[in-house]
From Swiss-Prot:
This is tRNA-2-methylthio-N(6)-dimethylallyladenosine synthase. Its cofactor is [4Fe-4S] cluster. GO terms for molecular function: 4 iron, 4 sulfur cluster binding; metal ion binding; N6-isopentenyladenosine methylthiotransferase activity. The gene is miaB. [4Fe-4S] cluster 1 binds at C14, C50, C84. Binds 2 [4Fe-4S] clusters. One cluster is coordinated with 3 cysteines and an exchangeable S-adenosyl-L-methionine. The keyword Transferase applies.
Amino acid sequence: MTAPKKLFIKTYGCQMNVYDSERMSEALVAEGYVETKTAEDADMILLNTCHIREKAAEKVYSELGRLKSLKADNPDLKLGVAGCVAQAEGEEIMRRQPAVDLVVGPQSYHRLPQMEARLREGHKALDTDFPPEDKFEELKARPKARRAPSAFLTVQEGCDKFCAFCVVPYTRGAEVSRPVTRVLDEARDLVERGVREITLLGQNVNAYHGAGADGNEKTLAQLIWALNDIDGLERIRFTTSHPNDMQDDLIEAHRDCPKLMPYLHLPVQSGSDRILKRMNRKHTADSYLRLIERIRVGRPDILLSGDFIVGFPEETEADFQATLDLIEAVNYGYAYSFKYSTRPGTPAAERAQVDPVEADERLQRIQALITRQQQDIQQSMVGRDVSVLIEKPGRFEGQMVGKSEYLHAVHVDQCSAQIGDILPVRIVEAKRNSLAAVTLA
């Protein structure tokens, strides 16, 4: 009997890539592969890549250079590149690294079985099309194996915003939303397999406009309310959002929907109106702050996170100070900051660049402010009672680890709860990146 071939997938970048890697794995497992934890043990290696910054793309080429040596020990090893680098660079990947056998873009994952068949015939395989068929509907049904208690579920893909710094519209395409019934079917399937929390994913998820059973388009808020009715699903989150698509019904859902968690990732990128205009964000710092105020009126305890780019072309010290002022005004529980990375083909790539040393210095300053806010908010949690979804054992005997409604990592000592339980606890200590808690009687 022939031993099954082994598959190793390494995932870079966003949560949607994590979801996509799961679906690619399922497609290939259905063709007889089994997953392995190490590249050295694999018969096929897939790198699911991110192209949002230059550094991320170069990491992929560095990893390909390392992995090609494995072919000397296993001549039948197949090496593939998926994701946004694959979409953006296509056959250039094979030219730059001839050891690569397969290149597949994000819209063609459902074609992996056919591409794998070409590999078995001795050919290379390349597919970076935007095919007319829906990849979500073409992918094989998910296996019924038990899942971790938290799961991602892609409901929307692509972006029509065309921010001046971003490659997503070029690598993921125009905005597409999955039909409500398909999302609900997948959510129920996940719940049957042990999932208690689902995070809805999209490059611009609050622009969701999937068709409902009545044929009419539904908003993200309407989808969330439909998910709220699924027995066994206890928590709902969504990411990533654009301020311009934060409509009234979604703000009201944060106020009223019992299963929608009090956490919102709402990137703004800059606090300078001048830079926001150059970024093509189509909102101002003031409109963003007024939106935050409206959200907090409905849900005062909501924890906010954001994204910031420093060193965007033509950014001055005054522009940067405006960003610091906005961060101070919002008080983020989490925020992610990045130095601007030139992406070929985007409008910002042609503009005057900020001195790299100055951009590095600004990045350090913004990260110091973000860290202080995060630690202050974590410290404010001490003494509060929260609910923790238990996800895994901790490092110490009797310790379990999970996350609160606010997405804080929480360690619970002397805990008899099982993975998947939702446990009331009291926070007793704020650590650097997590909280410590005790169970409530």
